[in-house]
Amino acid sequence: MRLCDLPDGSSLQHDDGRQWDEWVGIHGKPPSWMLTWMKSRWGNVLAVLCLVAFVLVAWKWVLPAASEVVVDWLPPELEQKVGRGAYAELKKRWLDQSDLSEAEQKKWRDMFESMLRKAEPKQTASDWRLFFHKSKILGANAFALPGGDMVITDELIYMLKDQPDTVMGILGHEFGHVQHRHGIKMVVKAGMATAMFGFIIGDATGFLATVPTVLMTQDYSRQAEREADAAAAQFLNANDLHPRVMTVFFDRLIASRVAKYKEKSDPMEDFPIGFSSHPPDNERIKFFKEWKP
């Protein structure tokens, strides 16, 4: 289809674009070489390649930088609202009621609160909430949500029940994500990406409904994981524990993966979300083993 605006404000429209172009070529001013080239197959290929390059550059560098700026302007109340909304949805989809008694849950919460008070004296109980859930889907896992909510699964507690220091280190890692606001940064980045794609394809509706899935399926960046690992190391060190206690978790999880997925060549492949492969797990194990204040 072709559309031509006339000087008096009216317009001409023709449904057959090829016929219109032939007529203009004979009776009117020929199109520029740039327009002709852009209409060609190679022009379309270049346009697609440029679009792909733009999206990759935006995802890798522009969106992370922009999300940092946006998050700095977000009020804590909004971040908390996003996190609690995500938690409510996760309870419907993937999280079941914990089998741990209220007394046992309180024991773990009190232990973490005591250690956090020693490591981060300025933090208060209102800055975080710790929930326990059973989950066949997530298995041995722990993760943090925007606004200070953290979840640890029964399966992880059972795996490390005789290693409370390691459990505390994992919670210290998740609280590191809370402190650095990694969760809300990931949500903002995904939201900006959705808006960008919506601008390109014309549909950006329904993003808020995908926030829980975004939080549970998107890996943190290498830098975010390093920051959370550093926070866990500092947390443990402040409580007179060497961060090498974290390696117990990796060792046991690898063993459980090997037993469950003998046919898989890489037992690290199914590491839980909170400890996904960014940076490589061997690098993280080395970090905890060799950590020095």
Features from the language model and the residues they span:
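N-terminal intrinsically disordered, acidic low-complexity segments at the extreme N-terminus
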Residues: 2-32
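A Zn2+-metalloprotease active-site environment signal
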Residues: 26-293
